[in-house]
Amino acid sequence: SVGFKAGVKDYKLTYYTPEYETKDTDILAAFRVTPQPGVPPEEAGAAVAAESSTGTWTTVWTDGLTSLDRYKGRCYHIEPVAGEENQYIAYVAYPLDLFEEGSVTNMFTSIVGNVFGFKALRALRLEDFRIPTAYVKTFQGPPHGIQVERDKLNKYGRPLLGCTIKPKLGLSAKNYGRAVYECLRGGLDFTKDDENVNSQPFMRWRDRFLFCAEALYKAQAETGEIKGHYLNATAGTCEEMIKRAVFARELGVPIIMHDYLTGGFTANTSLAHYCRDNGLLLHIHRAMHAVIDRQKNHGMHFRVLAKALRLSGGDHVHSGTVVGKLEGEREITLGFVDLIRDDLIEKDRSRGIYFTQDWVSLPGVLPVASGGIHVWHMPALTEIFGDDSVLQFGGGTLGHPWGNAPGAVANRVALEACVQARNEGRDLAREGNEIIREASKWSPELAAACEVWKE
C-alpha cells in the first residue's frame, strides 16, 4: 500500500489538540473566529492553526519528509464569546521554529498571512498574541526607550507635550518652520509633521527639515529647554527614507518620525536600527491602523499592531485618547498602553489582555494621545496616561484665538497645573475642571483657551 492516504481530510484530526500543553517557547495567538453556518468551531479553529502553519487543503506526499508534530500549529483551546452568537476565541500555539528571528514581517506573514480569506470562516480577528521571551530577544526593539528619552531631553515627572502642525498640507517650508517655532517657544516639547507630509510639490522634505531645525534651535536658545520636531522620514523607497534620516542626523535634531503601517515593518525595523546607531529618537504614527483594527469581528486588534511595533522599534506610538474625537474604550486602551511601556504585563481579560507578556527588558514605548483633545481634557489625560506619555494637541494649540504661541502656553500651564495638583494629592477625575479654572486666573492664555473650548 502507498505510504500515505490521498484526499481531503478534516483539519481537526491533526490540528485540534485540546490536551496540548503550551511551551514557554511557543508563540500563542488568540483568534476571534466566526465560522460559516454548519462548520463546527473545532474544525474552524483547527483550520486556522493549519492554514497559518504547515497545513494545506489536501494530504501531500511531502508531508512524509518532515515531522508535522514538530512544526504544526495547534489549536489547543476554544471558548464561546459571551454575548455573541456563533463567535469563538480559538487559541493557537505555534512552534518557535516556524519564525525567522528578528523579523516582524515574517511573523505576520505566518500568523495572519493567508488564513483571513479562508472559506470555512465568515470572519476572523487576531485579538492578541504572546511573544515568547526567546523570540523577543532576537529583536532590537525601540531605538532608545522611555528612560533614555527622558535623559536625552532632560524632562522628568510629567507627560510630554506635542502639537501637529496644521494645515497639514499646503504651507511653504518657511511658514511651516515659523509655526513650529511659535509652538515650541510657547512651551511645548515637540511639534510634529502630519503623517501625510512627506515630500510634496508645495514643500519638499529638505526645505522643511532645514527650516524646522532652525525653528528648534531658536526656540531652544530662548527657552533653555530641549525641543524636538518629528521630521517625517517616510518615503516611497527604503533608500530614500534612510537618506532623509541621515540628513536629519546631520542637522543634529533629536527625533524623526515614520508611518509604520503604510511604510511597512521591514522599512520600519531598518529605520529603528539606524536611529539607535545614530542617536535619533523615533516617533511612530499609525496611519492605516483603522483599516486593520476597526471591525470588531475581522482583522487585528490594535494591541497586536502595538506589540509588533515594540518589536520592530519606535520610541513613541499613537494609541488613541480615551477622550477627544477618536474612539477607544478606556480599559482596553489602558491595556495596550501598558503593553507597550511596561516590562511585564499580566493576563487580564477585562482589559483585553489574553496572555501574560514578559518583554525581558526590551525598552518601552511612550504612548501618544492625539486627536481632538484640548485644555479641558488635560486633567483626565494626566490621570489616565500618567507621566510616561506624550499628549498631542493639534487644533487644541493652533486653534487658540491669539495664535500658536499663546495656544502652547495655555497647554503647558494646564499640564503643569494638573501635575502639581496630582502631586499635592488632589483627585484629578473629580476636581479637574476646578483645577483648570484656578490655573486660568493666573494665565490669560489659558483663560482664553477655556472660553473657546467649553468643558
From Swiss-Prot:
GO terms for molecular function: magnesium ion binding; monooxygenase activity; ribulose-bisphosphate carboxylase activity. Mg(2+) binds at K192, D194, E195. Gene3D superfamilies: Ribulose bisphosphate carboxylase, large subunit, C-terminal domain (3.20.20.110), RuBisCO large subunit, N-terminal domain (3.30.70.150). Its cofactor is Mg(2+). It is an enzyme of class 4 (lyase). The record marks K325 as: Transition state stabilizer. This is Ribulose bisphosphate carboxylase large chain.
